[in-house]
Design a protein with these regions (language model features):
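Cleavable N-terminal signal peptides
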Residues: 7-9, 19
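Periplasmic c-type cytochrome electron-transfer domains
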Residues: 20-339
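Short, linear, compositionally biased motifs with a strong N-terminal bias
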Residues: 10-13, 339
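Bacterial N-terminal signal peptides that target proteins for export
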Residues: 1-7
Length: 339
């Protein structure tokens, strides 16, 4: 009788384990949402004319000093929206102190840039063009002068901003680029999984998600972008070695913002190294291990690290080739100025 009772208890325990595992998994999954098809804006209607204009402007070299750089120079759309360099070369080969984050899925983030200094992709688009270390244009007025001198852009701005007496403005430049970027989304098998298709991920990837979640990674990396929705201190539980960049503090001058950075999205993370704001971490395995040590206070085993990396690779989406295809750019006018 005692043996039978013991066997029955063991069988019941085994039966309950998958149920408990599913319950744990479901509780973590509630922290995520599938990617939307676009990131809508209350202040920037996404019309076809505006998106088409934004696509042209994204690839436009004439909005840089020397006419050699465009948004796509650092945020290459055929390479998941970045250039795989620690620092991107700007005007005359100058490099900044932070790596170029991906433009894919960026519009759904809480803010733009590593320090969050731009509240939207529309505002972000206006920054690099005038930065002397990036595209190097002398002023917003000069950018407008260039655009107004190109007949094709005169017509494109009229179509994108109908009813405006003076549609070619620097703010409208930002709105057009922003409209294009708001549909730069890369859904993956992870989204299918979140929508209920439990066959979308392999058993190893599902196990990797469980490891990722139970380790505590989901505290910061959650939501539709698997990150991008909060700021966090780099070196949260253990001081990050040789950290000089003061992060968000450099934008806000608020003492408590020192060493805080926008939490990066993990979408397409397997394709967007090197990692961190300074590109100092070369591999995904090293990044996961360091996050465990410095952000979570945990020494992840090699098996745990590998398991998490397996899950992260499932976040790789498909680049929308037709949407990002470089359009034919309008020809310069007879008096188009050069910076």
């Amino acid at each position: 009788m005692k043996i039978a009772t013991t066997i029955t208890a063991a069988v019941l325990a085994l039966a309950v384990q998958p149920v408990l595992a599913d319950a744990v998994s479901d509780s973590f999954l509630m922290m995520f949402k599938p990617l939307p098809t676009e990131a809508p804006s209350a202040d920037n209607e996404l019309t076809e004319a505006k998106i088409n204009l934004g696509r042209m402007l994204y690839y436009e070299n004439r909005l840089s000093k020397g006419e050699k750089l465009s948004c796509n120079s650092c945020h290459m759309l055929d390479k998941y929206g970045q250039d795989n360099l620690p620092f991107s070369p700007g005007h005359e080969g100058k490099v900044g102190g932070r790596s170029s984050p991906s433009t894919f899925n960026a519009a759904i983030h809480i803010a733009q840039f590593w320090d969050g200094r731009a509240p939207s992709v529309e505002e972000q688009a206006k920054g690099p063009v005038l930065n002397p270390g990036e595209m190097g244009m002398p002023s917003a007025d000069f950018v407008v002068e260039v655009l107004k001198s190109i007949p094709g852009y005169v017509e494109a701005f009229k179509a994108a901003f109908p009813g405006e007496a003076d549609p070619i403005t620097y703010n409208n430049f930002g709105k057009a680029v922003g409209a294009f970027e708001r549909k730069l989304v890369t859904p993956s098998r992870w989204d299918d999984y979140l929508k209920g298709n439990k066959e979308a991920l392999t058993a190893e990837e599902t196990k990797g998600f469980e490891t990722f979640a139970k380790a505590g990674c989901v505290t910061c990396h959650n939501g539709p972008a698997v990150g991008g929705m909060m700021y966090q201190k780099l070196g949260l539980v253990k001081a990050w070695p040789e950290l000089k960049d003061q992060g968000r503090f450099e934008a806000t001058k608020v003492e408590t913002d020192k060493f805080y950075f926008k939490v990066p999205s993990l979408r397409n993370i397997s394709e967007t190294g090197p990692y961190l704001h300074d590109g100092s971490v070369k591999t995904l395995e090293e990044m996961v291990s360091k996050m465990g040590e410095y952000q979570l206070g945990k020494s992840l085993t090699s098996e745990e690290t590998a398991s998490i990396v397996t899950f992260l690779k499932s976040l790789k989406g498909e680049i929308p080739a037709d949407y990002i295809a470089k359009p034919k750019l309008p020809e310069s006018g007879p008096n188009t100025p050069k910076a």
